[in-house]
C-alpha cells in the first residue's frame, strides 16, 4: 500500500513563530525536490531514470522477479497452463502457426514472446508509456449477435473477467478469434507446455488428460488418464491470461469437427493495462480542475487516481441525498446529473462529464446541502474521506501547504 505523504512518524506541524513555520515548510520543500512524477506524465521515464538505475531488479516497468526460479508443477484443476515435450503417437497437434497473438501485426509485443520459455510462473513486462501506446487499438474479429451472446455468457461466468468494466469487457469479446478444429484427436494444448491462450468452446467436446509425469509421454498412453471434459459454452486455459505457467493437462478434441474462440495473454493484459492507464490519466486531469485539490503534487494525484472507485447509477437514481452526512467526493466520468434542493422547484445546478461534487466532504462530515440525481445513466468515480486521509493525510494540511507556497514566510 502506498505510504501517506504525511506519515504519522513525522512530528506534527507546529503553528508558532514565523521562524517555526519557515523551518517546517523549508523541510517540506526539500523533500519535494526528490519526489517522483506521476507514471502518466510524459516525462516519467526520464524524470525517474536516476532513481531506477540505483536499484537492480526493480519491478517497475520491466524489472523482474525470480530469474533463477526452478520449474513449478501444478496438480490441480485441468484448466491450467505450460512447455512442450514429445507428442503422443497418433495424435495430431493443434497447428502452432494458428496460435499467435491476435493484435494487428503483433504490435507492441515483446521480441521474445512465446520463445524459449522455461517452466516458471512469469509474464511479459509491458510499458504503457512506451512509444506507440497511444496508437494501440485492441484487435477486432467480427461475430454474429448469437455468437456474442454465447461468448458473453461464457466470459461472464469466469472469475478472471468478473472485475472488468463495460469497455474492457467489450474489448475482450471483440478480441476473441475463431479457431476451427477440423478433426477428432487434435491436441489443442499439451500438458507441460507454456500456456499463452485462453479458450471458449463454441461447439464440439474436448477431453482433459493428465499424465503423472507432468508432461505428454511417447506411446499410446502418453497423454495419461481422462480427468474431465468440456462442451459448448465451457472454457479452459484461463490461467494462461495471467502468466505462462505450465499447462496442467492435455486437452484433445473428441468430435470430428469443433470450434474454439481464443484470446492470447498479451492482448488481454494490454487491454487491461491500456484501459487502466487511460482512466488514471483522465482522473488526474479531473483532479487538477478541483480547486480544493489543485495544490496536490503529481505523485499525490496519481495516488488519488488509483484510489477512485468507479460506480454506475441508472437514470433517475439518487447519487447523494440532501441532509445525508458527507463522506465522499465524486467525479462525473460519463452521463449527466442534476442538483436539487428542498423547497426549490427544478434543478439548481447541472453536471456533465468532468464535473465534480461533494468535495467539501473531504473536509468535514456536514450534511449534504443538496441532492444529486442522475439525469441519464451515469458513471462516477468516488473517493471517500477516510481513503483520502489514509493516502495523503488531512486536507487541512494540504490547504495549509498551498497557502504557504502562495504566500511564503519571509526569511
UniProtKB/Swiss-Prot annotation:
Acetylation found in the keyword field: no
MF terms in GO: cAMP binding; cAMP-dependent protein kinase inhibitor activity; protein kinase A catalytic subunit binding
Keywords in alphabetical order: cAMP, cAMP-binding, Nucleotide-binding, Phosphoprotein, Repeat
Residue span of region Dimerization and phosphorylation: 23-159
Pfam name, any one: cNMP_binding
Residues given in the record as 3',5'-cyclic AMP 2 binding sites: 292-411
Region annotated Disordered, chain positions: 1-144
Biased composition (Polar residues): 119-136
Family: Belongs to the cAMP-dependent kinase regulatory chain family.
Protein name: cAMP-dependent protein kinase regulatory subunit
Source organism of the structure: Aspergillus niger
Gene: pkaR
